[in-house]
Amino acid sequence: MVATLFETGVINNQGKFDRDLKTARIRETDNVYEYVLAYKETTHIDRDITINEIDIENLIRAKGAIYSGCKTLLSEVGMSMENVEQIILAGGFGSYVDLERAMIIGLLPEVEPEKVIYVGNSSLLGARMSALTNSIRQQVVGVTNMMTNFELSETPSYYDNYIAALFLPHTDVN
């Protein structure tokens, strides 16, 4: 929904509604601007369904953290998005992501859709596989021995990347 609002100019790159638009769908309620997605007469919950600027701001912060984390990590290991062969989306989150829309708002980097795969509940699947198969368990041990901890909060460029990502899609739009 946010991607559509952004693409159509209903919200700007800061997630604020265009107050000059001549539509009853944009209104101010309790000092917060909101957009009516569905009026209560068309819902089964006896109230309007809305999205407000606080909702959008929270989404922008969350996607900013994801984007800046990826960008910082890649930079710290001397890579860029061009080097990434695959993006794996795990958990329930991944199954609901519309790739095109996620890329429009900067939640995911703009890559070929074939590079993105959904794996569902990867932790549960991994636990089952390693419990049932010795060779998988050995691979897991091998991978864990190659892991390292990377603390984003201790990396100065993370904060710069985060601030730059607090826009739709983000300030790095090349």
Question: Where are the predicted features?
Answer:
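Helical "lid/coupling" subdomains associated with nucleotide-phosphate turnover
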Residues: 1-174
